[in-house]
Curated annotation (Swiss-Prot):
It comes from Pediococcus pentosaceus (strain ATCC 25745 / CCUG 21536 / LMG 10740 / 183-1w). This is Uracil-DNA glycosylase. GO terms for molecular function: uracil DNA N-glycosylase activity. PROSITE patterns: U_DNA_GLYCOSYLASE (PS00130). Its EC number is 3.2.2.27. The lineage of its organism: Bacteria, Bacillati, Bacillota, Bacilli, Lactobacillales.
Length: 230
């Protein structure tokens, strides 16, 4: 079978790729990409896994659905491509980062530097129709990404899971809390950020947890200028 992901995630998820539900999802996506405007483009669907190999994951920031605007999504939760306006939820993440660690917001939303350090920016659904939020829910992505979450939870080296909002917190049942760290709060969207996201200090809490595990903390400071890397 041809490789779908070009690192150790391929072995972790190989069993899922061989399931009937994944074959059905694949056929659904072939039709969707042929007939609809789908985000991200098909070459970036698995970008979160490509940039953050299974063995390198230290932190997971769970999202729900890719951004559904033009040129936004590139396969990572909350992140947008260079040159695209920073979405409101990410603006609020930057505000909390400044409040928590004194890191001033950058003028882009490209989070590759986080991914490169072991922050898996994973959406539970990996594709979406243009302008139609949640349009690809219930077609099989959730089963695949739930398997990824469980595999990380069971891995020998523990992980910090950052869960923002109800949809992310619903994944707690997949995580062994006796060995992994869960940091949870309201979602950073403008609708809910003031209900417990602001002031939750997820970035410093994550680094404290990593240091307690003997891991190097994340450098959350993003570069001021970026170019897209394939």
């Amino acid at each position: 079978m041809k490789k779908i992901i070009h690192n150790d995630w391929q072995d972790v998820l190989q069993g899922e790729f061989e399931q009937a539900y994944y074959a059905k999802l694949h056929e659904f996506l072939k039709h969707e990409y042929a007939t609809q405007n789908i985000h991200p483009d098909m070459y970036h669907i698995f970008q979160a896994f490509e940039w953050t190999p299974f063995s390198k994951v230290k932190v997971v920031i769970l999202g729900q659905d890719p951004y559904h605007g033009q040129n936004q999504a590139h396969g990572l939760s909350f992140s947008v491509q260079p040159g695209v306006q920073v979405p409101p939820s990410l603006q609020n993440i930057y505000k909390e980062l400044q409040s928590d660690l004194g890191i001033a917001p950058v003028q882009h939303g490209y989070l590759k530097k986080w991914a490169d350090q072991g922050v898996l920016l994973l959406n539970s659904v990996l594709t979406v129709r243009d302008g139609q939020a949640y349009s690809h829910q219930g077609h099989g992505w959730e089963r695949l990404t739930d398997t990824a979450i469980q595999a990380l939870s069971e891995r020998e080296q523990p992980v910090v899971f950052i869960l923002w909002g109800k949809a992310a917190r619903d994944k707690i049942k997949l995580i062994d809390q006796s060995r992994n760290i869960i940091i949870q709060s309201a979602h950073p969207s403008p609708l809910s950020a003031y209900r417990g996201f602001f002031g939750s200090k997820p970035f410093s809490k994550t680094n404290e947890a990593l240091e307690a595990m003997g891991e190097t903390p994340i450098d959350w400071q993003l570069p001021t200028e970026v170019l897209e890397e394939k």
